[in-house]
Design a protein with these regions (language model features):
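Generic hydrophobic, helix-prone segments enriched in Leu/Val/Ile
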Residues: 100-104, 352, 375
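Short linear interaction segments
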Residues: 360-394
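Short, charge-rich, low-complexity interaction segments located
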Residues: 67-73, 343-366
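Enrichment for repetitive, rod-forming helical segments
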Residues: 12-17, 42, 355, 367-368, ...
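Active-site hotspot residues in diverse enzymes, especially metal/ion-binding acidic/histidine motifs
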Residues: 1-344
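N-terminal functional modules and adjacent low-complexity/disordered segments of proteins
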Residues: 208, 265, 347-350, 358, ...
Length: 394
């Protein structure tokens, strides 16, 4: 329905009705926009074209019916996100999840109920949240080793990982897509784009907790979700084997090594040690004071690169290849140009060029090290090139 879609797209782009009128060059009034959104009037073809241009969609997208409704699970109670930003975030996520559910139906023919443990694990205590993380690992056959790529694990299990541009106060949110009968068609965990990988991973694991835990009213929901997230990424037995059952001192260098192993920030690692009673409260608080003093709460040293969602790009490319959607539709959803028949390597190359320079340098350096290691181990290439290089004196 035009009225609902118009309002959703406007709010997702953070535009007031006055701002939308200004972006359209004043060809309509604020009152007209209000009537369109209430459904009491319809725009002309000229106005529709301008609305679509400003909102960055095709005119047909404004008339499209939603295949689902989106239900939000929880905001961080301490996020401090303003009401206007909250509305914008909700509409961004609503649009993104609706598009993904529609895409999975068009490309994969998926319209059955989601195979996902929606609020399956009852949690009355924080220890219950710990056990729920162990049960979740068992359900997904994750073993006990650290999870190398959490985003990949989530996407492989039909959880949409959505990244959005949002204020720094926003850390994450989770949501479900449901049909008219209340069946779950999709689940999403949402994180702010641009955060370091260690924070991103805990944010996503925390949001996953909101979707799979049934938390008692008497228990702090955020603490339970964070306990679940920490336990999912650093299982009790594996973590204790690595760190020890009791510690009176933890070195900064060790924390940085553990950060790389478990993919968690130093602050989250220290919290995990405290949760498992590896360190006492006094020592934990002293570390918190030191971290604040050094300005590391938001910007820790040795930051890990963020993990990149792949499902959307992969599904769009498959859909275009199989004729389920056009390159133009793919461009709109992915935010980059896609040519018909374009090779995957070219698309990946342009996606690479959109990364920050520091991240590109890191990836190229890692690739160079891998190639050097390969050639050091495999000497067959020397035979193909005529053997060793010898230097001769004149």
């Amino acid at each position: 329905m035009l009225s609902r879609r118009l309002k959703q797209l406007r709010l997702a782009r953070g535009l007031s009705q006055d701002a939308l009128v200004a972006e359209m060059g004043g060809i309509v009034t604020k009152q007209s926009i209000s009537k369109y959104e209430r459904g009491s009037a319809l725009p002309s073809a000229v106005v529709m074209a301008q609305l679509a241009r400003v909102l960055g969609v095709k005119s047909a997208a404004l008339w499209g019916e939603s295949v689902c409704r989106v239900e939000f699970v929880a905001y961080r109670k301490s996020s401090g996100l303003g009401s206007r930003d909250q509305v914008r975030v909700e509409n961004l996520v609503r649009q993104a999840l609706e598009e993904r559910v529609q895409l999975q139906e068009r490309v994969y023919g998926l319209h059955d109920e989601l195979d996902f443990p929606v609020r399956r694990f009852a949690v009355d205590t924080l220890e219950d949240a710990e056990r729920a993380a162990e049960d979740m690992r068992a359900l997904w056959n994750l073993g006990s080793d650290p999870i190398g790529n959490l985003v990949g694990v989530l996407e492989d299990r039909q959880v949409h990982v959505i990244e959005i541009d949002a204020p720094e106060k926003f850390d994450g949110i989770s949501a479900f897509a449901l049909d008219d009968e209340g069946r779950h068609l999709g689940a999403a965990v949402v994180s702010r784009r641009g955060v370091p990988g260690d924070r991103q991973r805990l944010n996503l694991a925390h949001e996953l907790g909101h979707t799979v835990l049934k938390i008692a009213d008497a228990l702090d929901e955020e603490k339970a979700a964070f306990r679940f997230g920490g336990a999912l990424l650093a299982p009790r037995r594996e973590f204790t084997d690595e760190v020890g059952a009791r510690r009176s001192y933890v070195d900064l260098g060790e924390l940085q090594l553990l950060k790389r192993k478990f993919g968690l920030s130093m602050q989250a690692l220290l919290r995990r040690m405290r949760d498992l009673d590896i360190i006492n409260e006094g020592y934990y608080q002293q570390w918190c004071i030191d971290i604040n003093r050094m300005g590391w709460r938001r910007d820790e040293p040795a930051a890990l690169p963020p993990e990149e969602p792949q499902w959307l790009q992969r599904t769009l490319l498959r859909g275009i290849a199989e004729g389920a959607l056009t390159a133009e539709e793919g461009k709109t959803m992915l935010g980059m140009e896609i040519e018909d028949g374009e090779r995957l390597e070219a698309i990946q190359r342009r996606a690479f060029l959109k990364l920050p320079m520091e991240e590109r340098r890191r990836l190229l350096a890692a690739q160079g090290e891998a190639i050097a290691e390969h050639y050091a181990k495999d000497t067959a290439w020397r035979d193909a090139q005529g053997g060793e290089i010898h230097e001769y004196d004149d």
